[in-house]
Amino acid sequence: MATTLEVQKRETTQHSEVTRLRSEGKVPGIIYGYKSENVPVSVDSLELIKAVRDNGRNAVFSVTVDGKKLNVLLHEYQVDPLKDVLVHVDLLAVDMNEEVETDVRVVLVGDAPGVKAGGVLQQIIHDVKVSATPEKLPETIELDISSLEIGDVLTTNDLPENKDYVVQAEEEETVVTVSAPRAEEEPTTTEAPEPEAVHGKDEEPVE
């Protein structure tokens, strides 16, 4: 069952109105997608953060706009890098019976023996595209690294299969590796060359 999220329709998209909303702790946004034209809305910032924290980044939320109920996903969002606050959200209206595609975070689980042996763990891919019906979208995909030795690689083919969703990724793309540690270079010392003797003519004393 979708969690209810309170949104308010915006009557204007003028910059002054957007600034006012943000000063009041609200995030301007837009709803688009299934049975919905581009509808400008706003949502309370703290309420949105709490809803995502409690239900997950890929949760389905129920909103009401102009008396019409819609199921939406938090499709995209923008954050002010200086203030670390939400400044805009895109809410994608979805049909609960139709598959959608979204990014899902890849989480590494377990301890790699290669790391304990001094290897360096490097995660190359942090998110993958996943398609599923909205209520089946996973919050994360866990990848077990407990068998990785130095020199080992796990690819997109190693991501766990699940009947509820399909990972849309190129085959054999590297997700994580354990590489050998860099050898520390021995400091080298170079000896300064001996100064060469200068052979010149004997000078006559100046009177």
UniProtKB/Swiss-Prot annotation:
GO cellular component: cytosolic large ribosomal subunit
Sorted UniProt keywords: Ribonucleoprotein, Ribosomal protein, RNA-binding, rRNA-binding
Organism: Listeria monocytogenes serovar 1/2a (strain ATCC BAA-679 / EGD-e)
Quaternary structure, from the entry: Part of the 50S ribosomal subunit; part of the 5S rRNA/L5/L18/L25 subcomplex. Contacts the 5S rRNA. Binds to the 5S rRNA independently of L5 and L18.
Gene name, Swiss-Prot/TrEMBL: rplY
UniProt cross-references to Gene3D superfamilies, sorted A to Z: Ribosomal protein L25, beta domain (2.170.120.20), Ribosomal Protein L25, Chain P (2.40.240.10)
Family: Belongs to the bacterial ribosomal protein bL25 family. CTC subfamily.
Classification via Pfam families: Ribosomal_L25p, Ribosomal_TL5_C
Name of the protein in its database record: Large ribosomal subunit protein bL25
BP GO annotations: translation
The organism's taxonomic lineage, starting at the top: Bacteria, Bacillati, Bacillota, Bacilli, Bacillales
CDD domains in the cross-refs: Ribosomal_L25_TL5_CTC
Biological role stated in the UniProt entry: This is one of the proteins that binds to the 5S RNA in the ribosome where it forms part of the central protuberance.
